[in-house]
Amino acid sequence: FIESYERLIEMSDAIDIVTPTIAHFECASKALRASKHVFIEKPITHTVNEGKKLVSLVTEAGVKAQVGHVERFNPAFLAAKEYLNQPLFIETHRLAEFNPRGTDVSVVHDLMIHDLDIILSVVKSPIKKINASGVAVVSDTADIANARIEFDNGCVANLTASRISLKNMRKSRFFQRDAYISVDFLKRKTEVVRLKNLVGEPGPLDITIDLGKNKGSKIIYFDQPKVEESNAIKMELEQFIEAIRSDKQTAVTIEEGYQALVVAHQIMDKINSSLNVLV
């Protein structure tokens, strides 16, 4: 029997923090001040200020820190990554049936933040503008929310998250030049539609589209990449351990977790300022 979590920290080399969000900073900061490696569930902290302090503590401690954005390890997303190339428009839907667990934070911090992290990891461009709206239906924080993010490179992302739906859905669609990639995180399925210039005459089974007079035609290719069977939670923890053993950068850095938190708070600021949520 271990009488306190401080004693547990003292006895450990690495700490996995899965407490309610409001306790993340307290637990993580104690572990970091004891020079322990830290794996911390999303969102990294309750407030942006706490997140900023945590980033500094990780640097000062010189240890490994990874954030539990588990969808990065979803096999459907892993299968889609090689096809993603400067998407121009992204649409995400993350819908869940109501569960009292997680209502200590808004649906933006509980669910949408998964898609925010995925999008930020793919787009890699500063954000130019955010518009958002949301409503609190059964809890004291937003239960359904929509956000539109415009990036400096021209990409636009439209995100919808709900925790009061009748069915579950976790799907993202990426539109880019001559390609469309659909990722179903729930069913673990990836579909890719690609266009290529038609050279010569099409084959008997080719599907083509005519682009108009003097613009030629394109062939439509349908791909369904193989999605490997894997356990995303196990994979993220294994990569965390490997980063410690090999002294490599963690798969989802504390800075990336902080950036997702910052954007989530910016979205909630927009929602709260719209007066659609009673706070």
Give the location of each predicted region.
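A short helix->loop->beta-strand "cap" motif at the edges of active sites that frequently abuts
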Residues: 34-36, 61-64, 155
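Contiguous beta-strand/loop segments that form the cofactor/metal-binding neighborhood of enzyme cores
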Residues: 116-195, 199, 226-230, 234-248
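A contiguous active-site-proximal alpha/beta segment in oxidoreductase catalytic domains
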Residues: 45-102
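Structural alpha-helical scaffold elements that stabilize or flank donor/cofactor-binding regions
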Residues: 7-8, 83, 260
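Beta-loop-alpha module in the N-terminal Rossmann-like domain of NAD(P)-dependent dehydrogenases
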Residues: 1-39, 43-55
